[in-house]
Amino acid sequence: MTIRSKKAYVIGLLLSLSSLAFAQQAVLFTPAEQQQIFITTAGLFSNGNNFTIDFSDVDDSEYCFPLPVGNASLLQGYSLEIVTSKGDAVKAMFDGAVRMSRKSPQYGNIIIIRHDNGLETIYANNAQNLVKVGQRVKAGQTLAIVGGNKNKYSCLFGIMVNGGWINPTIIVDPNSHQLRSQVIRCTKKSNRVDIGATKTDLQRIVS
C-alpha cells in the first residue's frame, strides 16, 4: 500500500468513525414528548422571549427538501402535501434528533425531528418509518418510505416552533424546494409564537 493510499484509507476510516459517533449520540425524550405531537420545547426560550435562525448562508449539506423530486402544495396554510412516486424516500430537512416515530390515528406513520436550530419538522402518512426515537439524523438522511395508495403517494410535511404549526412557506419555497435566504425571528407571545423575517424579500413568501 502506497503512502497516498494509506492516507486515503486513514481519512476514510476517520470519517466513518465520526459518522458512527454522530449516529450513536442518542438524545433522551420524555414519554410525553414521544407521544404528544404538539408539545412545547423545553428551554427553547430560556434566554429570552425570542431567538433567530439564520438561513442566509446555509450549506448544501445542511439542508434537504423532504422529497426532492416531489410536487408540493400548501394545505390550509400550515402544512405541505408533497406528492411523489411509490417507494420514494422521505428525507430529513436539517440535522436533529428523532422525537417521535410511531403510528398516529390522525396522521398514520409519523416522524417528528427536533432540530438543532430550534425548529421541529413533521413527516406524516409514511408507509414505513425507518428511524427510532432518540436517534440523531443528518440533513438528507432517509427517515421513511412515502405512503399512499394506487392513486396518490404523498408526504404530509409540517414545521413547528414550540409545539405550534407555522406556515412552512415562510421558510421554504414549495415550487423551487429551496430555503428562503433570510434571518427569521421567533418571538414568544403568551401561548403562541410569532414568526417574522428580519432580512428577506418578503414578496417571495407565498401567502
Could you describe each region identified by the protein language model?
Residues 81, 89, 112, 122, ...:
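Conserved beta-strand positions that form and line the central face of beta-propeller blades
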Residues 11-18:
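Bacterial N-terminal signal peptides
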Residues 24-108, 139, 169, 181-207:
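Surface-exposed, glycine-biased beta-strand/turn segments
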Residues 83, 114-116, 160:
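A generic structural motif
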Residues 135-201:
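Conserved, short, structured surface segments that act as functional micro-motifs
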Residues 92-130, 154-156:
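Zn2+-dependent peptidoglycan hydrolase active-site motif and core
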Residues 19-23:
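Sec/Tat signal peptide C-region and signal peptidase I cleavage site
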Residues 2-10:
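Bacterial N-terminal signal peptides that target proteins for export
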